[in-house]
Every structure is written in C-alpha cells, then in structure tokens.
Regions:
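Histidine-acidic metal/acid-base catalytic patches
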Residues: 1-2, 8-29, 73, 98-100, ...
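Catalytic-core regions built around general acid/base machinery
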Residues: 47-58, 146-156, 211-214, 246-250
Length: 290
C-alpha cells in the first residue's frame, strides 16, 4: 500500500524500485510486492533480477507476493483458466524472490455499481457504494466459482512450496472473519490460510482479539492499520480505536510467528507515519515480550 499510495495503482517499475529504496531507507527489511494485472506481472517478471539485486543490496527480502487477477472469479471459464495460468507464473516469480507466502483477494462479485466500483481503479477508503443485484446473479454459483479457483490456486502454491493466503476486505466476496472461515473450510487445505487485516476487519465492527482467536493457526500474515471502526481507513496504529494490546495478547497465545506488514496509506506525511507505526509495533512487542 505504501508504493501504491505514493505512485499509483499499479506503480511503474521505476516507481516500484524507488519505493523499495524508500522503504529500506525507513528501516524496513521485509517487503510485500504486488502484481496488479497481467501487464504489471510481465513487467516485474522481466525485471526480476533488477528487483532482486536491489533488495539484496539493501539487506531486504520480498516475504509476501500478492498477484491480483480479477478473472479468477469470472463467469467466463476461459478467462478463469487464463487467470489461473497467470497465478502460476506469479508463484514462479515468488519462488525467485524466495517469498514465504503468496496472497490474493476474493474480489467483488459481478454486481452493478452505480458509481465507484471497489478497488477497480484505485485503493480508496471510506466510500459510500450504490449497488444493484443483476437479475441473473446467483450467489451459490459465484461461491462455487470462488471456491474452485481458490482450490486451484492453493494446489499451485503448494506445488511451489508457498503458503497461500487470502485477505478479507470491505466490499469484497469475503469481507469478514466468519466468511473467511467458511472459505477455509470449503478449500480444505492445511496450506491455505488468512491475512488478518486489522483495518478492514475493524471497519466491519469485529472484535479483533476474537477474530484472531477464531482464525488461530490459520493466520499466515498480518496487515496492520488503524481506524475509527466506521470507515476502512488505513491509519497508523494508535490513531484509531483498535485494542492493540488485546489483539497482540491473543496472537502471542496462539503462537503467531509470521510477519506484520505496516499497511497504512492515503495519509499525509506517509514516511513519518510509517516510521511511527514501526516504533509502535516494536514497543508493543517489547512490552508483551513477543
């Protein structure tokens, strides 16, 4: 979200490399990288050595790779098959970067939005949506497509030695913890789990310590941001109303050992806010002996 907030969706290769330099200058050594469509994936893949060399030179690593292909949930079987092939290419790129996890989204169903469609052109928060359900839309059919695609992606990820995770997001097919648990149950794989995104789940009025308890060992990765519990803004931790100590006590109890990604964006003085977020998490970790 850092590079996207500063340089667009998706950022160009030049801006991506600049973002890596800036993130490492701020003291971060574990990085998440996204591929937001087939063209962006090709650009990253064609310049994989350049990206890897830059990370290595700065003592950084790409721990999570996030390919975003909306056609994974298309009603058109040919489009879905193409998206699956692109996902496999993405897993190969994740292997090149020595990533530990590969992540995607569950996307927005084919509804009719009168105005802005969530996450289509940009990542924006606090929007009011106007939605119409098309006469031919059937949730059961869409859910079956989603589950099938997630199963296929999981098999590919597993074959490449990668854990596969999905992020519940406001405005998408899986938008809360219980929907995520339903998807985990449907996919039926020990290799498949969740990204606990604090900003999105808090905006869904969830009790985050309970969310962590529900997901338990199925939490593979964490996105850290804060908000007021009404809008899904992604502010630095401490600027909203999340019970951070309560959440981290549960994460400690369930034995979470993965990465915490500072996932703030679309805020003034982003670099300063990133550094403050990092310090907040470090102090909390020291306090709770994480």
């Amino acid at each position: 979200l850092y590079a996207i907030s500063k340089y667009g969706y998706p950022p160009s290769l030049k801006k991506t490399l600049k973002g890596v330099r800036e993130m490492t200058d701020l003291g971060f050594r574990a990085i998440e990288l996204e591929a937001i469509n087939s063209q962006n994936l090709r650009e990253l893949s064609n310049n994989r050595e350049k990206i890897r060399e830059l990370c290595d030179s700065r003592g950084a690593s790409i721990v999570n790779f996030c390919p975003i292909f909306r056609d994974l949930v298309s009603y058109d079987k040919r489009k879905r098959s193409k998206a699956i092939r692109l996902f496999e290419e993405a897993t190969e790129l994740a292997n090149f970067f020595d990533s530990e996890t590969i992540q995607t989204d569950t996307f927005t169903p084919p509804l009719r939005f009168e105005g802005e469609t969530p996450y289509k052109e940009a990542i924006s928060f606090g929007r009011q949506l106007s939605v119409r359900i098309p006469p031919d839309f059937r949730w059961q059919k869409f859910w079956a497509i989603l589950v099938d695609s997630m199963r296929r992606c999981d098999r590919i990820a597993q074959q490449h030695g990668l854990k596969f995770c999905v992020e519940p997001r406001v405005g998408e097919s899986v938008s809360n913890t219980d929907a995520m648990l339903r998807l985990i149950e449907a996919v039926e794989s020990s290799n498949f789990g969740a990204v606990l995104d604090t900003g999105h789940l808090h905006a869904q009025k969830e009790i985050l310590p309970l969310s962590a308890e529900k997901l338990g060992k199925k939490i593979f990765y964490i996105h850290v941001s804060d908000n007021d519990g009404r809008d899904n803004f992604h502010l630095r931790p401490g600027k909203g109303t999340i019970d951070w100590e309560g959440l981290f006590r549960v994460l400690k109890r369930i034995g979470f050992q993965g990465y915490y990604a500072v996932d703030i964006g679309n805020v003034p003085s982003l670099d300063d806010e990133m550094v403050k977020s990092k310090r907040f998490l470090e102090r909390l970790g020291e306090k709770l002996k994480l």
